[in-house]
Curated annotation (Swiss-Prot):
Protein name: Capsid protein alpha
GO CC terms, sorted: T=3 icosahedral viral capsid
Residue pairs linked by disulfide bridges in the UniProt entry: C61-C310
GO biological process per UniProt: proteolysis; symbiont entry into host cell via permeabilization of host membrane
Annotated segments matching region Disordered: 1-46
GO function terms (MF aspect): aspartic-type endopeptidase activity; metal ion binding
Family: Belongs to the peptidase A6 family.
Marked site (Cleavage) residue numbers: N355, A356
Positions bound to Ca(2+) 4: E216
Gene: alpha
Feature: compositional bias, Basic residues: 1-12, 28-40
Record organism: Nodamura virus (strain Mag115) (NoV)
Repeat among keywords: no
Keyword Protease in annotation: yes
């Protein structure tokens, strides 16, 4: 009989051979894994280097907040060729919400207009409640002071992005209520209506007027929304969702929509837009951001409203702004692909405390989805501290 110890001694060389064979077979696998990781890093670096400086500036303007001192970039790097005037609009304003009311802040892609504001009783409809404009600083310098010279300096526009944030400043013992955010697709249309002329017999004439479709959504809360306590605040972005960045003309002669001599019923509009001290300038190709703040009776809700927009204008040659125009940047497919990827994947909105998480998500989209490294600063200081792993190669571009 062969003892167990003897059998173990005889089997030991065979076990050692198998272990050595396994180690030898694993070595190529490890080398392949290292080679794959090395190739991925090289691809990330190559793609980053392939992206042009104007492309990086475009993403910086589109997705960096106004808290950072950045220029508006050199324009949208698509196939358009011509002189453009990139502009980064910024608004920072304190706001107090009326107790017992629900306040609608509609951030729409209207050049020079930060948002439209309306108030209604809690639970009531916004139908027929005028949306009053809140202008960006410098509106008159860009669009003139009268409705007849709105297009004297710039004749056309297209949006790269816009964003808005409500940052509560209320006392923690006095606030109450909720904040809800969702997107509304608005469209400028030309509607017809019949007008009776006092002749004998009376004559009916067909008239045309511009109108904004989609405002009925002010009374709707879609499933795809952000809802939270007022004290949590919100931050949201909207980008161009059309296949191309199309230019739209600057509208002239409209102090309201519909015009003053046309009723909402005639224009088939849910409610009207008023522009006290400003004018209606047109409507771009991106969803409006609807921010609904509900303030119960007795609550004290105050906040800082921040709105920003990256817009590209076509300057008028007879304007003094023409000398500041520049050639539109060359087509950059890497930057445009990054823009579209982020547009698909960013959430409707986030709470103020989650700003860092929001921007970490944007950064991960750029790294994993497109295999190039970048870093994007956040909308508030807390967001900037949440970003890790800044790539030194392009870090200076995002400071």
């Amino acid at each position: 009989m062969v003892s167990k110890a003897a059998r173990r001694r005889r089997a030991a060389p065979r076990q050692q051979q198998r272990q050595q064979s396994n180690r030898a077979s694993n070595q190529p696998r490890r080398r392949r894994a290292r080679r794959t990781r090395r190739q991925q890093r090289m691809a990330a670096t190559n793609n980053m280097l392939k992206m042009s400086a104007p492309g990086l500036d475009f993403l910086k303007c589109a997705f960096a907040s106004p808290d950072f001192s950045t220029d508006p970039g050199k324009g949208i790097p698509d196939k358009f060729q011509g002189l453009v005037l990139p502009k980064k609009h910024c608004l920072t304003q304190s706001i107090t919400f009326t107790p017992g009311k629900q306040t609608m802040l509609l951030v729409a892609p209207i050049p020079g207009i930060a948002c439209l504001k309306a108030e209604a009783n809690v639970g009531a409809s916004f139908s027929g409640v005028p949306l009053a404009s809140v202008e960006f600083p410098g509106f008159d310098q860009l669009f003139g002071t009268s409705a007849t010279d709105t297009a004297a300096n710039v004749t056309a526009f297209r949006y790269a992005s816009m964003a808005a944030g409500v940052y509560p400043t209320s006392n923690l013992m006095q606030f109450a209520g909720s904040i809800q955010v969702y997107k509304i697709p608005l469209k400028q249309v030309l509607n017809s209506y019949s007008q009776t002329v006092a002749t004998v017999p009376p004559t009916n004439l067909a008239q045309n007027t511009i109108a904004i479709d989609g405002l009925e959504a002010l009374d709707a809360l879609p499933n795809n929304n952000y809802s939270g306590s007022f004290i949590e605040g919100c931050y949201s972005q909207s980008v161009c969702n059309e296949p191309e960045f199309e230019f739209h003309p600057i509208m002239e002669g409209y102090a309201s929509v519909p015009p003053a001599n046309v009723t909402n019923a005639q224009a088939s509009m849910f409610t009207n837009l008023t522009f006290s001290g400003a004018r209606y300038t047109g409507l771009g190709d991106m969803d409006a951001i609807a921010i609904l703040v509900t303030t119960p009776t007795g609550a004290v809700n105050t906040a800082v409203l921040k709105v920003w927009a990256c817009v590209e204008y076509r300057p008028n040659p007879n304007s003094t702004l023409y000398e500041f125009a520049r050639e539109s940047p060359a087509n950059d497919e890497y930057a445009l692909a990054a823009y579209r990827k982020i547009a698909r994947d960013i959430p409707i909105a986030v709470a103020c405390k989650d700003n860092a998480t929001f921007w970490e998500r944007v950064r991960s989209i750029l790294k994993s989805g497109l295999n190039f490294a970048s870093t994007i600063p956040g909308p508030v200081g807390v967001a900037a501290t949440g970003i890790k792993g800044i790539i030194e190669t392009i870090g200076s571009l995002w400071v």
